[in-house]
C-alpha cells in the first residue's frame, strides 16, 4: 500500500524521493528527514517538556508519524534538537515535516525527461 505513490500518480517515479528540513520557533528547533525508500521506519528523538498541550496527548504525535511511515513506506527521522515549550516543539516538528515532504515529493530535474513505465524502458 503506497499512500504517496497513489497520491502523486506518475510524478512518483520522477520525485526526488528524500528531503530534509530544519524549522525554528523561538527557543525550539527541530529536524525532519524523509526518504520514500519503500522500507518503513520511524526514528523518533523527541522529549516533550510536558505530556499534554491543553487536552491533547503529545504521545499522539509519535503515533501519527508511525501511521504515516507505515502507509507511505517511508523512513522518517524526527529530532527535536532544542525546546523548552511543548507547543513550540510540536509546531517545529510539523513545520520541518511539511518542508521535508515538499522537498521529497518535488520533481527531480535529472528525471524530468524520463517517461514513467513499469520498467522505465520507454
Regions found by a protein language model. Give the residues of each.
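Structural preference for solvent-exposed beta-strand-turn elements
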Residues: 10-122
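Single conserved hydrophobic/aromatic residue that forms the stacking wall/gate
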Residues: 2-12
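Buried hydrophobic positions in well-ordered alpha/beta secondary-structure cores of metabolic enzymes
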Residues: 1-2, 97
